[in-house]
Amino acid sequence: MRIGGYRLRQHLKMLAPMFALLLVVWALRWIIGSLGTPGWLLQVMSITAATPVAVLLAVLVIHSRRFGGYVNVVVSSFLLNFWAESLVVAAIAFSVLTGISNVYAVPEFSVTGPDPMHLRHIRAHLTFSIGIGTLAGAAMGCLLLFLLRRLVPAKPAEESPAINRWKP
């Protein structure tokens, strides 16, 4: 199956550094939260804030390597948001299964009301967070790609050696 002229594997390969960035932010937030650091530091290490940054980085890669167009931006936004929310859900599930609290399952970052198994919290991450994050990231990314194409035209295909690496 091709999406915007490229296979899913090619999208995943292109997004690998952004996946790694999100994984590092997720792990650092978990570690910092376990150490009992101040709340402002937890807010700095936010996977919710890192995901749009990863989408913008993906758009820069898409533009500089001529890796498709707006469809590829939307797919990249979805894949990055899905990865980020899957990491958060894994941390919440770990907390529920082991009984060890972590920053992702504390009440101030959870859905209000009685939910000892965090099912509503997990469901919210898998539905609303992925959906809204994908739409917001795609809108922001498509706007950036539009501006980049108007203001900074990419080099012709034959001049850039990095382009051939991403061809199907």
Feature-to-residue mapping (PLM):
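Juxtamembrane/disordered regions of integral membrane proteins
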Residues: 1-168
